[in-house]
Amino acid sequence: VFAQSLCKGFRVSIDDHLADFDWSRIQTYVGYAEMVPNAVRELAASDVKEAARLGVWIERILLSVAGPCEGCAPVATVLVAVLPRMTPPGRSVALDLLSQISAAEITGPAHEQIGAVDLEEIRQAVASGFQYYVGMLRETASSDADLYSCIGLMDILAFHDRSLAAEAIAALKAVRTAGRATGLAVLIDNTLDDLADPSSDSA
């Protein structure tokens, strides 16, 4: 499958990726991020119930009504890096988290922001997994939940970085929706509309 080919020659461990950041200095909505490495390790090996629990916890520490926090970019970087090593439930939750992180906007006043928040940096971190998301869309065995997340990722990432639009559009058009959730085809059509060349909208 595509994930195996993507990881060919991949020898870096989850701990190696986690070691790229000093989590004791990264701020989240519930304090510093010292507990993130263990949560990522657990998510990578999780079953459905545990993955859901960890997803709720990670979302709670990273996102609020005020927008994303400083921890979003490093957490997104690590989640992308370990996607190929995750159990299917863990991967589904990670993709959902990445979709939410990429879509997060700063909606509160500056004094409510936690740490240094750079939306472009956050989206670039999420976009480092772009080829993986494309592969998931082209993979016939992908779950509906994973497809929903990856469609959302295409929408946000290619909308903000037009250099990704052509490949995103091709991947979306290649998704086979027969036998899938009824809303999937509608979501794809709406996303394709979002990604249409803006010049074609002028009339």
Question: What do these predicted regions represent?
Answer:
Residues 70-77, 110-115, 124-128, 163-171:
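Short sequence/structural elements of tandem HEAT/ARM alpha-solenoid repeats
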Residues 103-138:
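Eukaryotic alpha-helical solenoid repeat scaffolds
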Residues 2-49:
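N-terminal "cap/leader" segments of large eukaryotic alpha-helical scaffolds
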Residues 37-49, 77-84, 88, 131-142, ...:
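HEAT/HEAT-like alpha-solenoid repeats
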